[in-house]
Amino acid sequence: MSMTPQKALQCIIEHREILQDEMVQLMRQIMNAEVSGIMVAAILAGLRVKKETVGEIAGAATVMREFSRKVNVQDRTHLVDIVGTGGDGWHTFNISTCAMFVAAAAGAKVAKHGNRSVSSKSGSADVLEALGASIELQPLEVAEVIGCIGVGFMFAPIHHPVMQVVSPVRREMGVRTIFNILGPLTNPADAPNILMGVFDPDLVGIQAHVLHKLGAERALVVCGRDGMDELSLGTTTLVGELRGGRVREYEVSPEDYGMAVSPISNLQVESPAESREMLLDVLAGQPGPALDVVALNAGAALYVAGVAQDIGHGVALAREVLFDGRARDILDRYVAFTRRPRYV
């Protein structure tokens, strides 16, 4: 039976799940601009109140992937995305962006998907620009830089132009919707391994199961007990691990990896410029909470990418490339590559 926007809204009002294949039909209609703004807003608000299910999220993500501009990475060995939903409200420096250079220096290939800031002080695109990189690389160029250097950034508006269809509605609504959790699920390089931070502990298991439905090989979905969408230094972190087709949940703490507990205030910034300075201090090997949190998250990325045997081994590899300058070298090479005349 075909799923119309009206039928979908009726399902939602009655607190019934929209089946995954029905969600695929619905999202295709939305992405093809066949659904009015009023109906889109009603469906998005209703899903938020009802709470989106694994099948609904997976169906919506499937369609967003269909409509994306793909990045074809030839050698997919140890290919990983380090990504977060954002929206945790903590305004920390760009931990995952820093971690991508560390993970690449230690042997992973990082295909990072991101955007400018909406609610934080500095989005991944903002800090990369502050570092001097060009963020507007086309899909072929992103594949090339990943192949040459081991790291690439996919600027969401370039790879998901169809999102312009729903942007006015989302902007006017001004609240979180399913689209806030779809972005990290729609990596244009189809990275088979994912380290994903989420802003809500309830999403840890949900997103891990969604990634399984979407065909991910390995994933770590993390949320600090303080609400941080990274592995946190301030408290324990809830982890949902997808491996071998199964999801298990557990907790880790900074002390597990020889790190001191540290308040999030030590990691907060007010602008992309401040985030840039903190990121450069970390890549210079300056000890402290910022370096620790980057090593922790890069270590998790190296584990999920299959480079490290476990998170602790990954942390050790991350510290090594931070202290010997290899991580900073990856950043410098990346910026230079993206600024070549044909990319500007």
From Swiss-Prot:
Alphabetic keyword roster: Amino-acid biosynthesis, Aromatic amino acid biosynthesis, Glycosyltransferase, Magnesium, Metal-binding, Transferase, Tryptophan biosynthesis
Cofactor(s) the record lists: Mg(2+)
Binding positions (anthranilate 2): 170
Metal-binding keyword on record: yes
InterPro entries, sorted: Anthranilate_Pribosyl_Tfrase, Glycosyl_Trfase_fam3, Glycosyl_Trfase_fam3_N_dom, Glycosyl_Trfase_fam3_N_dom_sf, Nuc_phospho_transferase
Binding site for 5-phospho-alpha-D-ribose 1-diphosphate: 84, 87-88, 92, 94-97, 112-120, 124
Cofactor: binding comment: Binds 2 magnesium ions per monomer.
Reactions catalysed, as given in the entry: N-(5-phospho-beta-D-ribosyl)anthranilate + diphosphate = 5-phospho-alpha-D-ribose 1-diphosphate + anthranilate
EC number: 2.4.2.18
Pathway annotation from the record: Amino-acid biosynthesis; L-tryptophan biosynthesis; L-tryptophan from chorismate: step 2/5
Database matches in Gene3D superfamilies: Nucleoside phosphorylase/phosphoribosyltransferase catalytic domain (3.40.1030.10), Transferase, Pyrimidine Nucleoside Phosphorylase, Chain C (1.20.970.10)
Record's keyword annotation contains Amino-acid biosynthesis: yes
GO molecular function, one term: anthranilate phosphoribosyltransferase activity
NCBIfam families, sorted: trpD
Summary of the function given for this chain in its UniProt record: Catalyzes the transfer of the phosphoribosyl group of 5-phosphorylribose-1-pyrophosphate (PRPP) to anthranilate to yield N-(5'-phosphoribosyl)-anthranilate (PRA).
Protein name in UniProt: Anthranilate phosphoribosyltransferase
